[in-house]
Amino acid sequence: MPERADGSPRWIVRRALKVAVAGALRAAGAHRAVGTLRRRQAGGARVLVVSYHRVTHDYRASAREGLASLLVSAGTLRRQLEQLGRTRDLVSLADARRILAEPPGTARARDVVTVTFDDGYADVHGVALPILRALGAPATAFVVTGLVGTARRLPHDRIYAALAELTARGIPPERAGLPRGAQALLDACARAGPAATLDRLIARLPQPRLLEVADALAARVGLSDPDLPAGTRLLDWDEVRALQAGGVEVGGHTVTHAVLPHLPAGRARREIAGCRDALAERLGRPPRAFAYPNGYHTPAVRRLVADLGFQVAVTTEDAENVRGGDPLALRRKMVWENTTLGPAGYSPALATCNLEGVFTALGLVRPVPGEWRALAAAEEERARPPGRSPGPRRSRAAAG
C-alpha cells in the first residue's frame, strides 16, 4: 500500500529520516555520480519518461477519497517539472524516441525528460494543462476512448471506491456477500487493504471477470459511477481536442482499459485498433503513441501495437531507457505526491534522489519491474499449492 501523508508521528519520523538520507546523499554528490554512470550505460544521454495520472488542487482531500498513488497536487507538479527542467531539456515523446534511436555514444549537452499522463482524467485538461503551458513543457496524454465523454469511470476507480466503502463499514472482502462467482474471484485476490486487493485483481483477472467483480461490488455498497469522487471523471471529446490544440499529444490507451496480455489476440487487436480509429476520427489524425494499461505487455502485444501503426509505446517499468532499445517498450518512472514530499512539504533533496534514480541505484528503493515479469510471477503464485505463503510483493499502487 502507498504511504499516505497522514501527518501521524510515525509518518513524520519516516519522512524526516528519508529526507535526511536524501540530503546527505545529495550533499555528497551521489546524484552526479549516478548520473554519470547511468548516462554511460544509456549510450550517452539519459532519457527519463515520467508518468502521472490525476492532478488535483487539494492532494489531501483527494487522497482521502481515492487512490493516493495516482495523485499529484498542482503545486507539486509544477515544482517537480521546474526541478527536472533545471538539469534536463523538456521534450516531446517523439523527440525522446528520436534521441534513443541515435547511435550509442552520441553526446548531448543535457539529458532529457518527457511528461506523460495516463487514463485521461479530466483534470489533465482543467489543472495540468495551464501548468504545462506556463512551463513550455511538451506532454502526452493517453486516453481510454470508450470512456471519453461518458459518465462511466475506470474499473480501478470503481473497485477501489467500493472496497474502501466496505472497509469503512468494517466488512472484510471475504465477507462482502457478493454473488457466488464474483465472491470467489474476490476471495482469491483479497489482501490487506483496498489498494493491495485491487492490484491482485488487476494482475489476475481478464477484463470480463474484473468488470464482474466491479459491478458486484458497486451493487453491494450502492455506488453508481456518478457517485464516485468528482476527480475520477474522465475527459470529454471537447477537452481532448483542447489538449491537442494546447500542444499536448494524445495517445492511445485502449478502448476499455483492458489488460492486454489477459485477452485473446483478436480481442486485444480490437482494443488497440478501436482506440486508434476513434482518435483518428475525432482528432483528424491517427495517434503515434500508445500506453499499455497498467503497463502490462508481452512480445505478442508489442507486435500488435507495431502492426497497428504505433511508433512508440510506454510501460511502467522503472529502469533506464537505453539507446538501441525497443521504442515499443519505453520505461517510465511513476511519479506522484509522495515522490517528493517531506514532513514539511516539498523536498528538493528527496526529489533529486527519487527522480534521478539515486535511491534505486543504491538499492534503497525497489523499482517497479517490467510487467511481463510481474505477470510471470503472478502465474507462478497462482500455481502455488494451497496453504503455502507467498513471498513479499510490492504493491503497484506504491509505484514511484
Language-model features: locations:
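Long, hydrophobic, well-ordered secondary-structure blocks that form the structural core
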Residues: 116-158
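Residues within well-ordered alpha-helices
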Residues: 80, 128, 236-239, 301
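Acidic (Asp/Glu)-rich catalytic clusters
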Residues: 85, 131-135, 235-252
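Extended, charge-rich helix/loop segments that form flexible
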Residues: 40-47, 51, 151-246, 370-383
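C-terminal active-site subregion of NodB/CE4 polysaccharide deacetylases
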Residues: 2-116, 123, 154-168, 173-175, ...
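Short, flexible active-site-adjacent loop segments at beta-strand->alpha-helix junctions, enriched
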Residues: 53-56, 145-147, 254
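CE4/NodB-like, metal-dependent polysaccharide N-deacetylase domain
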Residues: 108-109, 121, 129-142, 184, ...
